[in-house]
Amino acid sequence: NLLQFGFMIRCANRRSRPVWHYMDYGCYCGKGGSGTPVDDLDRCCQVHDECYGEAVRRFGCAPYWTLYSWKCYGKAPTCNTKTRCQRFVCRCDAKAAECFARSPYQNSNWNINTKARCR
């Protein structure tokens, strides 16, 4: 779920950046998403959105609300969960958190005018 995803992000980036910085970044990080991602970090969010969509289509999951079990080993969020939905959503979140950690954060892409830049 979204709360657990936030903790995964903190795990992967060693708390180097507050989680809320990712809530309104580029064209895809945060609510909704459209157009061409502005950079690699925004592309991580696009892939995460697509992964959640796949969870809904393939398994009928509710990814924003699905609780799962995971642990933080070093900087690696590791899923340890049973059901198909839990496993799939957990992996979506873990992959995105790791992607965030390896992608540069450009302050100029935070809180952008999405109507103008995300076509």
Curated annotation (Swiss-Prot):
Please verify whether the record's keywords include Signal.
no
The EC number(s) given in the record are 3.1.1.4
| Species | Oxyuranus scutellatus scutellatus (Australian taipan)
Q: Name one GO biological process term.
A: arachidonate secretion
Its cofactor is: Ca(2+)
Where is the protein found, in the record's own terms?
A: Secreted
**Molecular function via GO:** calcium ion binding; calcium-dependent phospholipase A2 activity; phospholipid binding; toxin activity
What protein name is recorded for this chain?
Answer: Basic phospholipase A2 taipoxin alpha chain
Q: Which GO terms describe its cellular component?
A: extracellular region
How is this protein organized at the quaternary level?
Heterotrimer of alpha, beta, and gamma chains; non-covalently linked.
What the protein does comes down to:
Heterotrimer: Snake venom phospholipase A2 (PLA2) heterotrimer that acts as a potent presynaptic neurotoxin by blocking synaptic transmission and synaptic vesicle recycling. May act by binding in a calcium-dependent fashion to neurotonal pentraxin-1 (NPTX1) and neurotonal pentraxin-2 (NPTX2), but not to neuronal pentraxin receptor (NPTXR). Also binds to taipoxin-associated calcium binding protein 49 (RCN2), a protein localized in the lumen of endoplasmic reticulum. Monomer (alpha chain): Snake venom phospholipase A2 (PLA2) alpha chain that possesses the same high enzymatic activity as the heterotrimer. PLA2 catalyzes the calcium-dependent hydrolysis of the 2-acyl groups in 3-sn-phosphoglycerides.
| Family annotation (CDD domains) | PLA2c
The UniProt entry, under PANTHER family, shows:
PHOSPHOLIPASE A2 (PTHR11716:SF51), PHOSPHOLIPASE A2 FAMILY MEMBER (PTHR11716)
